[in-house]
Swiss-Prot record:
Protein name (record): Myeloma-overexpressed gene protein
Keywords in alphabetical order: Proto-oncogene
Coiled-coil positions: none
Source organism of this protein record: Homo sapiens (Human)
Region listing for Disordered, in residue ranges: 107-129
Amino acid sequence: MALRICVTYTPALPIGLCTRCCLCLEQSPSWCHCLRGVSFLTFHLHQSVPLGDRDSLLMFTRQAGHFVEGSKAGRSRGRLCLSQALRVAVRGAFVSLWFAAGAGDRERNKGDKGAQTGAGLSQEAEDVDVSRARRVTDAPQGTLCGTGNRNSGSQSARVVGVAHLGEAFRVGVEQAISSCPEEVHGRHGLSMEIMWARMDVALRSPGRGLLAGAGALCMTLAESSCPDYERGRRACLTLHRHPTPHCSTWGLPLRVAGSWLTVVTVEALGGWRMGVRRTGQVGPTMHPPPVSGASPLLLHHLLLLLLIIILTC
């Protein structure tokens, strides 16, 4: 049944990825099997952007494969299985919001460049590529890589700079880190977690920005503590025989500490009033007003508590 549901409701995904997902589900108990199936379908059905172009399809496939692999790790039972299903569903919702925000930003960028010629756009794209290559090449050791990124149909550099790891908390909400090379100093897949930070600026919302920024930074810290670094959370969820403490020992404390450090540092520096303009410069942005009758600070802390529960249960 799960195989039939997966094939029926995930037409945009390659058959191989869908089959891997279903094979994973069939190895679990019946109720756990259903929970994981629902969580994966939630991830896909919330996808609101049509996957017509090759770039969007490639990105969606990579993200989907990343989350499916994370859900397969551990082969847990009982409440751990429920927590895995919840985490996959929440991460899927995050990615869906990321795609929706990217689609809106592409439309705004097209409107901003209405008076430019094709030659001008080509020159701008070339300048962005040269600048991006220079920043990636000159990145020092121990840094998070942020590069200029061009979406389909958009030639504007949205993100700039390379932030030192020690400054990651300070710039986590001010600077959207949209993309990195597949391999950052030998750590494969690190760009997947860094992409979460891009949603903070793309969504232009303090509450959602907290979830995105805290999730990106604390998960990056947790994964960076793994000496046996493989592929995303799979390395952190799989026990390794290693003479030194690895992610199964330090991952949970780092994730919790990273979440709290993110919100405390950003609140102290007034980071919720900062954002990244499409020109690549850090500056003030307009946020929507908070929900009437709700304290923004209290809302941030409640959302952070929910994030910690989901990541650590």
